[in-house]
C-alpha cells in the first residue's frame, strides 16, 4: 500500500537530484534520517548514477534503480535481497501516463538526455546523450490525457529543445501536431535554449494554444563568460531573439548563474549592462557552486559568496520590476487573463495565467480546476488579484 506519511512507510523511494554538490549532500542526509527509523531506502533519479554505487556499497540504501529500470520498480520493491539495477543511459522511456492524481495539468516527457557540454553541468554525464521519445507515442499520450480532462499540457525533458534532432523531427513540428488535438487549451514548455528556436518553432508562435511565456536559458549575458562556461549561445544574438519575442507579446524567463569562476568585476559590469537590455519578466537565478566532476569545478573560485549574493539580488530586483511593469501594461491595454485554477489557498483561488504569473481570485463560486477568463483585475507588485 502507498501511504501519504513517509514516517509510516516500510519502504521509501528517494527520487534524487544531483545538479549540485549540496543536492547530493541533502539527499544523503535525508537517506540517513530514514534509515535511522528502520525503513528501507530505494534510491532513484540522477543521484542513482552519481552516488548510487557509493551509497549501495556502504549499505546506506537497500536498492538502486536507474531510469531505464523504473518499469521494474514494482517487482524490485518486493525483493528481499539488496539490488543495484542502474540500467543504461541509452534507454528511451516508453511508458504512457494517462492520469495525474490531484493535478489540474498533465506533464508529458518528450525526451531524455543532453548533448551540450556546459562547463558547470553534470547532467549529461548522469542522463546520457539526447534522445527523443517516439512522436506517435507522445501524440497518443496527449490524446488520452485530453480525453481524461487535462486540457493544459506541460512538455518536459532534460533538454526539450533538442527534441527530434535524432529522429528528423523538431520541437516546433511536435508542438504543431499537439496543438491540433481536440480538448487541449494550452501547452506549456520547460526550459529551451536560444539556439533551439528555429523556423519550425517560429511557425507556431502565434498559435492560441501556446503559452505566452517562454523560458529560454541564457545562463549569462557576458560574451566572455559564456565562452568560459562553454555555452553555445551569444549574448548579442540572444538579445535580438528576446526583443523579437517580446515584441509579439511573450513574457520571457531565463536561468542565470552568478559568481562562476572568472566573473571579474569587468565581466560582471558588462553582463549587468547587457542584462538590463533584456525584456525579462521571470528569473531562475542562483549563485554558482562547484559540482564535482565538471570542468568548472577544477577552476579557482574567485568570487566570494557575499559578492555573488549581492549580484543575485540586483538581477532579481531588475526582473521583479520588469514583471510588475509587464502586468501593468497588459492591464492598461485592456488585456484579459486566462487562468487555470489550481488550488484554494485560504480565501483565494490561485492559478497561473497565460504569461505564467500567479493570479489570486476571490469568488463565491466553485472554480477549482476550472478555466477563468478575467477581464478586470488589480495589479500589485506581488501579483494580480481578481474578484468574480
Predicted regions mapped to residue ranges:
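Hydrophobic alpha-helical scaffolding
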Residues: 128-131, 190-191, 231, 261, ...
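Short, glycine- and charge-enriched coil/turn segments that flank and shape catalytic ligand pockets
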Residues: 37-38, 78-84, 165-173, 247, ...
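Terminal RNA-binding accessory module
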Residues: 298-388
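Conserved loop-to-beta-strand segment in the C-terminal subdomain of adenylate-forming
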Residues: 291-297
Amino acid at each position: 500500500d502507498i501511504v501519504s506519511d513517509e514516517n509510516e512507510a516500510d519502504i521509501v523511494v528517494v527520487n534524487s537530484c544531483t545538479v549540485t554538490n549540496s543536492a547530493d549532500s541533502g539527499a544523503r542526509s535525508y537517506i540517513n534520517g530514514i534509515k535511522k527509523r528502520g525503513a528501507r531506502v530505494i534510491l532513484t533519479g540522477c543521484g542513482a548514477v552519481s552516488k548510487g554505487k557509493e551509497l549501495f556499497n556502504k549499505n546506506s540504501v537497500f536498492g538502486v534503480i536507474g531510469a531505464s529500470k523504473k518499469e521494474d520498480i514494482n517487482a524490485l520493491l518486493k525483493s528481499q535481497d539488496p539490488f543495484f539495477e542502474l540500467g543504461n543511459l541509452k534507454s528511451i522511456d516508453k511508458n504512457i501516463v494517462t492520469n495525474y492524481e490531484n493535478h489540474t495539468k498533465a506533464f508529458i516527457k518528450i525526451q531524455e538526455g543532453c548533448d551540450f557540454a556546459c562547463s558547470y553541468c553534470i547532467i549529461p554525464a548522469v542522463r546520457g546523450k539526447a534522445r527523443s521519445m517516439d512522436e506517435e507515442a507522445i501524440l497518443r499520450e496527449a490524446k488520452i490525457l485530453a480525453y481524461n480532462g487535462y486540457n493544459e499540457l506541460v512538455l518536459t525533458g532534460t533538454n526539450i529543445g533538442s527534441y527530434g534532432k535524432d529522429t528528423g523531427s523538431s520541437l516546433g513540428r511536435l508542438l504543431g501536431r499537439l496543438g491540433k488535438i481536440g480538448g487541449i487549451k494550452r501547452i506549456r514548455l520547460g526550459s529551451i535554449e536560444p539556439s533551439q528556436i528555429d523556423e519550425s518553432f517560429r511557425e507556431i508562435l502565434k498559435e492560441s494554444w501556446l503559452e505566452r511565456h517562454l523560458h529560454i536559458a541564457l545562463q549569462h549575458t557576458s560574451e566572455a563568460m559564456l565562452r568560459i562556461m562553454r555555452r553555445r549561445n551569444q549574448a548579442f544574438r540572444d538579445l535580438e531573439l528576446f526583443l523579437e519575442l517580446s515584441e509579439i507579446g511573450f513574457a520571457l524567463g531565463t536561468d542565470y548563474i552568478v559568481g562562476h569562476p572568472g566573473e571579474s568585476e569587468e565581466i560582471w559590469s558588462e553582463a549587468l549592462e547587457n542584462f538590463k537590455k533584456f525584456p525579462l519578466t521571470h528569473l531562475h537565478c542562483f549563485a554558482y557552486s562547484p559540482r564535482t566532476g565538471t570542468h568548472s569545478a577544477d577552476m579557482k573560485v574567485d568570487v566570494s559568496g557575499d559578492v555573488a549574493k549581492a549580484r543575485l539580488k540586483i538581477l532579481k530586483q531588475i526582473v521583479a520590476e520588469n514583471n510588475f511593469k509587464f502586468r501593468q501594461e497588459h492591464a492598461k491595454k485592456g488585456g484579459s487573463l486566462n487562468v487555470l485554477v489550481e488550488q484554494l489557498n485560504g480565501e483565494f483561488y490561485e492559478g497561473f495565467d497565460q504569461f505564467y504569473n500567479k493570479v489570486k481570485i476571490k469568488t463565491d463560486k466553485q472554480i477549482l480546476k476550472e478555466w477563468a477568463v478575467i477581464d478586470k483585475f488589480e495589479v500589485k507588485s506581488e501579483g494580480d488579484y481578481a474578484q468574480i
